[in-house]
């Protein structure tokens, strides 16, 4: 009985705190930073939050894998953009967790870049996209964006584009004039 009590105390005080630091289900760290980006992975909620402090392209982002959404708050434009993620191109939740775990992004080269065009209509009800997106985009106008098909010519002023990088996996161009700015 004495040994059972001692092993219970060991589990309670020694193992439990170390298990709390692990991501349930896969053991990868829940947050990390790479370059100018801070990343938080919530595997249970199928969501990744990104904060990029790069002075040339500062942005916050949420990748909502459950709903297939990308939300990006572009500080240079003082606006948020909401779009569908192309699951064939975007890195998976597991890819990003592995990259954070190994901190070896040279093994995860950039796959390709995507271009999105901002649509003129504003998002009226952010709450329907979940609390994290609503909170991030609360104080700025939010617009939908549409992915451009690869190989189509864009009649867009290249100076209207904001370039963002998702780790080393993927470059995104969000182009178009934001109405009212």
From Swiss-Prot:
It is found in: Secreted. Residues 1-20 form the signal peptide. Residues 53-145 form the BRICHOS domain. Pfam families: BRICHOS. This is Gastrokine-3. Keywords: Disulfide bond, Secreted, Signal. One of its GO terms (cellular component) is extracellular space. May inhibit gastric epithelial cell proliferation. Gene3D superfamilies: 3.30.390.150. Disulfide bonds join 80-137. It comes from Sus scrofa (Pig). Belongs to the gastrokine family. GO terms for biological process: regulation of cell population proliferation. It comes from the Eukaryota.
């Amino acid at each position: 009985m004495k040994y059972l009590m001692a092993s219970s105390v060991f589990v309670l005080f020694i193992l439990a705190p170390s298990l709390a630091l692990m991501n349930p289900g896969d053991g990868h760290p829940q947050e990390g930073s790479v370059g100018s980006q801070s990343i938080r992975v919530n595997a249970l909620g199928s969501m990744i939050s990104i904060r990029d402090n790069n002075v040339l392209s500062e942005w916050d982002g949420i990748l909502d894998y459950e709903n297939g959404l990308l939300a990006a708050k572009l500080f240079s434009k003082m606006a948020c953009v909401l779009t569908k993620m192309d699951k064939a191109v975007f890195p998976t939740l597991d890819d990003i967790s592995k990259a954070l775990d190994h901190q070896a992004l040279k093994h995860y080269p950039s796959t390709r870049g995507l271009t999105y065009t901002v649509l003129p209509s504003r998002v009226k009800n952010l709450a329907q996209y979940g609390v994290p997106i609503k909170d991030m985009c609360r104080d700025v106008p939010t617009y939908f964006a549409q992915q451009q098909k690869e190989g189509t010519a864009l009649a867009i002023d290249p100076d209207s584009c904001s370039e963002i990088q998702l780790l080393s996996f993927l470059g995104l161009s969000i182009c178009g004039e934001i109405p009212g700015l």
